[in-house]
Regions:
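Polybasic "coupling" helices that flank or enter modular domains
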Residues: 108-177
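A cytosolic small-molecule/anion-sensing beta-strand core signal
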Residues: 26-27, 45-46, 67, 91, ...
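Glycine- and acidic-residue-biased ligand/ion/polar-headgroup-sensing regions
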Residues: 39-52, 57, 67-69
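Phosphate-/nucleic-acid-contacting segments
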Residues: 153-215
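Regulatory nucleotide-sensing modules
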Residues: 4-46
Length: 215
């Protein structure tokens, strides 16, 4: 769901914005809600965030998932008065909050940063389109594999399997839009194939070989 290219661009911008406020969130916490005043840009230092849209009829849908190195809430830069979606953490997350004025100042004073940020936004929009296609046409097994790879940041160049301790099967089922029994079935399959490993304390280790499921 994320590419190394725009992840690096986001990191460059982040390094230039050191005066932001860092907030830490537990899983399932709302960072901002749809309809709230749109006044800050957010950058994910650590964690996974889902963007949720609620229709006028009250139906909700997940627009996409964001991981380390991603921005969200950037609509405030373009003059949007309210957030068009809600942002909710899926795992423990560390978020850098950048004031709108500071972000605009950075973009105006650093032309190359402006170019990088535009490229990032275009890449991010393309990824959200791919997420929607994924939900509409791909199997639950492939959606689960993509989410697990996102959790370990493999798509941003990380080569080593880290241990994920805060994601249960109910959360994974919510993330990919299926049931817990289906997630359990696929997780057992991934374990038998050596794509994932459960640690003695209940943590989950995800191996890059899981990407074979997406082929």
């Amino acid at each position: 769901m994320s590419s190394g290219k725009h992840g690096k661009s986001g990191k460059i911008i982040f390094l230039k914005v050191l005066s932001g406020k860092i907030l830490e969130y537990l899983p399932s916490k709302t960072i901002f809600s749809q309809g709230e005043q749109c006044k800050d840009v957010h950058y994910i230092e650590q964690g996974v965030v889902k963007l949720v849209l609620v229709s006028q009829r009250g139906r909700s849908g997940v627009l996409g998932f964001l991981g380390r190195g991603d921005f969200f809430g950037e609509a405030c830069i373009g003059g949007h008065a309210i957030y068009q979606t809600s942002a909710i953490t899926m795992v423990p997350s560390k978020i850098l909050v950048i004031e709108r004025k500071k972000m605009i100042h950075l973009i105006e004073k650093e032309p190359h940063v402006c170019t990088q940020f535009i490229n990032y936004l275009l890449s991010r929009n393309h990824r959200i389109e791919q997420d929607l296609i994924d939900h509409l046409f791909n199997s639950s097994e492939k959606r689960l594999a993509r989410v697990l790879l996102l959790l370990n940041d493999y798509e941003k160049g990380n080569e080593n399997p880290s241990i994920i301790e805060f994601v249960n099967q109910d959360t994974l089922a919510e993330m990919i839009g299926t049931t817990r029994p289906r997630v359990n079935f696929f997780m057992n399959k991934f374990r038998r194939l050596g794509y994932v490993h459960y640690t003695h304390n209940g943590g989950l280790q995800i191996y890059k070989s899981l990407s074979k499921v997406l082929q």
